[in-house]
Amino acid sequence: MNIRTLDDLLAEEVTGRRVLVRADLNVPLDKQTGQITDDGRIRAVLPTLGALVQAGAKVVVCSHLGRPKGSPDPAFSLRPVAGRLGELLGAPVHFAEDTVGDSARSTVAGLADGQVALLENLRFNPGETSKDEAQRGAFADQLAALADAYVDDAFGAVHRRHASVYDVPARLPHVAGRLVLREVEVLGTLTGEPDRPYVVVLGGSKVSDKLAVIEALLPKVDRLLVGGGMCFTFLKAQGHEVGSSLLEEEMVETCRSLLERAGGKIMLPVDVVAADAFAPDAPHDTVRADGIPSKRVGLDIGPETVAGFAAALRGARTIFWNGPMGVFEMAAFAHGTCGVAEAIANADAFTVVGGGDSAAAVRALGLDEQAFSHISTGGGASLEYLEGKTLPGIAALEN
């Protein structure tokens, strides 16, 4: 892959130069208090920002947060992120009240060497996500005018054809940040020749969300362990009753075909935790996966399945995990995710956690992040990379 890196930029002397860093600071906020509930994505960009600060660059950070509708919305402001980023960097971060307006221009103009500014949410401007190339390009022109060089360190957004990811690199000297480089190296290992046995664990709610990655991975993996809400569509494809559990009827035939083609590679739950309702305090017990009672809803994999999955993971040399095994946000239905995560952490293997809900689960369940070889910051981006798709943000860096 022909991509210039942050080290290439640093070698050119960046003291006093304005460097625009596209970060992925799309962190979860508590709906009541507005407090950041998981700062993993902020921490992930620190190596790149720290190197630029150390080198005396004027660092201008930009990011999106949530899905505002192309206009300012206080619920999606990056202001709390500026505060947390400053704490982690050990120096105040200057916050611009807009993205490319008067506040952004004056904030950037006022930066001293080695200082950091954070622009307001990119998605407050309709040009960021516009399908119209002219509108997107006009916004990219304004963003690029704030800087002399561009660093993409937002792996979680490289699968988006957005102005800050795809169009700005065409307007400035551009490089990949430390995080993007590490992500591409790790995922390249998984798509190349991973050490065997290679075991993939997939969870999450929908088969339809994971179908393309299952199709891409099946020929490459030795075992594919399926949990989460998506397992019920596979169980239905085997002819089992799934009660009121999450089911994609239109995917049953597809799952049947996958099971036939997999030749025994796909491992499904043998027991599940079924509840009377989708609620944290609902009465629940463990039932056989091949006969979930009607009106009961499966919300986690059962202990026998956890033990079986753990046994399959024990001898693996490469493991990729994407998607929780159950509704881990409810304590009663977090045991499956926790048990499988611990088995992955304890495996003598190269272990990759594929972003999104899985990364959130590792932190929410208090597991040691250092126990995994790599925790990706890109849920959708990591899956699309494994599917073999061209990622717009990576393509823009290669140009």
From Swiss-Prot:
What is one process in the GO biological process aspect for this record? Answer: glycolytic process
Give the signal peptide range: none
Report the EC number(s), separated by commas if there are several: 2.7.2.3
What PROSITE patterns does the database record attribute to this sequence? PGLYCERATE_KINASE (PS00111)
Q: Which GO terms describe its molecular function?
A: ADP binding; ATP binding; phosphoglycerate kinase activity
- Show the catalytic activity: (2R)-3-phosphoglycerate + ATP = (2R)-3-phospho-glyceroyl phosphate + ADP
* Leading EC class: transferase
- InterPro entries in UniProt: Phosphoglycerate_kinase (IPR001576), Phosphoglycerate_kinase_CS (IPR015911), Phosphoglycerate_kinase_N (IPR015824), Phosphoglycerate_kinase_sf (IPR036043)
Q: Specify the domain of life of the species encoding this protein.
A: Bacteria
Residues that bind ATP: 210, 298, 329, 355-358
GO CC terms, sorted: cytosol
Q: Which UniProt keywords are given for this protein, alphabetically ordered? A: ATP-binding, Cytoplasm, Glycolysis, Kinase, Nucleotide-binding, Transferase
Per UniProt, subunit arrangement is:
Monomer.
Family, similarity comment? Belongs to the phosphoglycerate kinase family.
This protein's name: Phosphoglycerate kinase
